[in-house]
């Protein structure tokens, strides 16, 4: 009998209950008992939803108060000194949130948050563990064991989920001194042994150990460590399933297949070609879990196609076949049943986490009971849906396809080199040394959100809505003028999300009402869905930016989202390549850039926050991606005069290893996230002479803590050691949408003061 199981479920809730509870707790409006009650309710609801869908073995340990990697850090006692209790007490929820969000100066002298970065190539973020050379590990957090008891008390068959020891170490960074993280392995392994043995005592039969780094290019010493680690852990008296995802095992396939564990999960959505080899190499005693339902997208599974593989696998494996999503459903919205505004045709093409669990269960049942009436019915429905989607005229637009086919190499090149452009731009803009600016968005107040919501619901006329947004723009411009910022932004009050705002105005996108996924902590995003060929029917931002520019003599930046970020932060099509979708988006944005320039806007920022996120996990696949991603950016930015300055912004982008490709984008100014990593990103400039201007972020906007002027001066001086002062800009790490006005103004006052101090001492 094939078994249906799941690797993980979204934790935020159908209506983002976790987000609302977290934020109420942080504001002091909900106590810890209330927060914990919300968590218990969500876990119970999610386990029941999976069970009702037909999942036989439920994941436990996939719930996290902020991030699953942070949960593991607390579990192992990997708590930086600045967050440790002075009396040596065990960590609390307050400790967890302090590590994630930082502590303000008014509390215990202040402590900056841990670094946050992308979870592999997804739009989820994790808190990077900080390891010291003398790192000690101790079991310090009981959450996993408590949740196992919760689930068992509710009558569920459970499969606890833990991040494997090698993946956990790989994800962390060394602090204080440079050393080999593998040196910590012998200190860490006893904790895994303790955890596994405690789970066995709790009656757990199977544990899922996530080792996604097996889909990466691993150094030989890390490969060598695998067999030793799992030889040690095999002593624990419970069965172990190693879960790999986000890519193929490739050169790690033999290693993974032969680890001394009881089962292996592989991702057949991202890497279907690995199936025949793994089937041949898998020892005869092992379970093979096949991830055939896409855990990272919203499209309904082609059940017949998946069944072809599963039927073949079942002939070989029999009861050793498990059926699963490709990865945790953390990256999928919760429940399509909540969507009551989508048209029936589009809705029939989609599946969210609950529906994906149903698909997994149906596939397992189709193997076990192929003649069952519900199996026959659902498979017939699936065939009909796949046919309609493949032939729908809503998807294919000949005019868009013809324009993409007509793209020439010259279309993605500026007319002159940077040296010639920057001379004209400096003359026209007349900015001081160390020019100050922000990344784009300002705080989204409840009044702003209410105005947008009322307009969408028809409760506010268009004229009243425009005046409400104009009022917010006037407020943002006035504050920036008073602060003394040099290049201004309009604040983006009219934008709900940097992708959704544009996607709403492009043909080829569709929107959900409840398609939320977690980005980090309480931050949820609702990715737009690309379902067809993409084009821009009319200008999207010009009137707002023109209005803002009319309020000031200073330069006002036009603010756009770049093609790669639009693609990476949307749920993309599966029927055409990402490259084709990026080119369609680039042409639409190119038209907007030209319109902004024609309206008198001298600076246009095209954000590519997700540029590095698109990199394939395997380095051998990087060149092709970097070629089309940089070409897409240049395509949307190149049809302007020399005098028009093109900016781009990248956040959470560790791009030391792709700095040449960043330079190939040929943006006149790039702003990047650097403060959390203490300007570590700038190490790239020691070996590569980046030719254009750069604004390394001088403070972390993800924390409510207000940085001091002295901290920012120190970071800028550090940056000036690697980048000529005449090419340095001064800016925050990212947009200020999620912050409140008081902390925003206080931080920007200090930032402007830091820039002025550098000008005075330059």
Swiss-Prot record:
<dbReference type="InterPro" id="IPR038071">
    <property type="entry name" value="UROD/MetE-like_sf"/>
</dbReference>
<comment type="function">
    <text>Catalyzes the transfer of a methyl group from 5-methyltetrahydrofolate to homocysteine resulting in methionine formation.</text>
</comment>
<dbReference type="InterPro" id="IPR006276">
    <property type="entry name" value="Cobalamin-indep_Met_synthase"/>
</dbReference>
<keyword id="KW-0677">Repeat</keyword>
<dbReference type="GO" id="GO:0003871">
    <property type="term" value="F:5-methyltetrahydropteroyltriglutamate-homocysteine S-methyltransferase activity"/>
</dbReference>
<feature type="binding site">
    <location>
        <begin position="16"/>
        <end position="19"/>
    </location>
    <ligand>
        <name>5-methyltetrahydropteroyltri-L-glutamate</name>
    </ligand>
</feature>
<feature type="binding site">
    <location>
        <begin position="439"/>
        <end position="441"/>
    </location>
    <ligand>
        <name>L-methionine</name>
    </ligand>
</feature>
<feature type="active site" description="Proton donor">
    <location>
        <position position="702"/>
    </location>
</feature>
<feature type="binding site">
    <location>
        <position position="492"/>
    </location>
    <ligand>
        <name>L-homocysteine</name>
    </ligand>
</feature>
<dbReference type="Pfam" id="PF08267">
    <property type="entry name" value="Meth_synt_1"/>
</dbReference>
<dbReference type="Pfam" id="PF01717">
    <property type="entry name" value="Meth_synt_2"/>
</dbReference>
<keyword id="KW-0808">Transferase</keyword>
<keyword id="KW-0862">Zinc</keyword>
<feature type="binding site">
    <location>
        <position position="492"/>
    </location>
    <ligand>
        <name>L-methionine</name>
    </ligand>
</feature>
<feature type="binding site">
    <location>
        <position position="607"/>
    </location>
    <ligand>
        <name>L-methionine</name>
    </ligand>
</feature>
<keyword id="KW-0489">Methyltransferase</keyword>
<feature type="binding site">
    <location>
        <position position="651"/>
    </location>
    <ligand>
        <name>Zn(2+)</name>
    </ligand>
</feature>
<dbReference type="GO" id="GO:0009086">
    <property type="term" value="P:methionine biosynthetic process"/>
</dbReference>
<feature type="binding site">
    <location>
        <begin position="523"/>
        <end position="524"/>
    </location>
    <ligand>
        <name>5-methyltetrahydropteroyltri-L-glutamate</name>
    </ligand>
</feature>
<keyword id="KW-0479">Metal-binding</keyword>
<feature type="binding site">
    <location>
        <position position="734"/>
    </location>
    <ligand>
        <name>Zn(2+)</name>
    </ligand>
</feature>
<keyword id="KW-0486">Methionine biosynthesis</keyword>
<feature type="binding site">
    <location>
        <position position="607"/>
    </location>
    <ligand>
        <name>L-homocysteine</name>
    </ligand>
</feature>
<feature type="binding site">
    <location>
        <position position="613"/>
    </location>
    <ligand>
        <name>5-methyltetrahydropteroyltri-L-glutamate</name>
    </ligand>
</feature>
<dbReference type="InterPro" id="IPR002629">
    <property type="entry name" value="Met_Synth_C/arc"/>
</dbReference>
<comment type="pathway">
    <text>Amino-acid biosynthesis; L-methionine biosynthesis via de novo pathway; L-methionine from L-homocysteine (MetE route): step 1/1.</text>
</comment>
<feature type="binding site">
    <location>
        <position position="649"/>
    </location>
    <ligand>
        <name>Zn(2+)</name>
    </ligand>
</feature>
<dbReference type="GO" id="GO:0032259">
    <property type="term" value="P:methylation"/>
</dbReference>
<keyword id="KW-0028">Amino-acid biosynthesis</keyword>
<feature type="binding site">
    <location>
        <position position="118"/>
    </location>
    <ligand>
        <name>5-methyltetrahydropteroyltri-L-glutamate</name>
    </ligand>
</feature>
<feature type="binding site">
    <location>
        <position position="569"/>
    </location>
    <ligand>
        <name>5-methyltetrahydropteroyltri-L-glutamate</name>
    </ligand>
</feature>
<dbReference type="GO" id="GO:0008270">
    <property type="term" value="F:zinc ion binding"/>
</dbReference>
<dbReference type="InterPro" id="IPR013215">
    <property type="entry name" value="Cbl-indep_Met_Synth_N"/>
</dbReference>
<feature type="binding site">
    <location>
        <begin position="439"/>
        <end position="441"/>
    </location>
    <ligand>
        <name>L-homocysteine</name>
    </ligand>
</feature>
<comment type="similarity">
    <text>Belongs to the vitamin-B12 independent methionine synthase family.</text>
</comment>
<feature type="binding site">
    <location>
        <position position="673"/>
    </location>
    <ligand>
        <name>Zn(2+)</name>
    </ligand>
</feature>
<protein>
    <recommendedName>
        <fullName>5-methyltetrahydropteroyltriglutamate--homocysteine methyltransferase</fullName>
        <ecNumber>2.1.1.14</ecNumber>
    </recommendedName>
</protein>
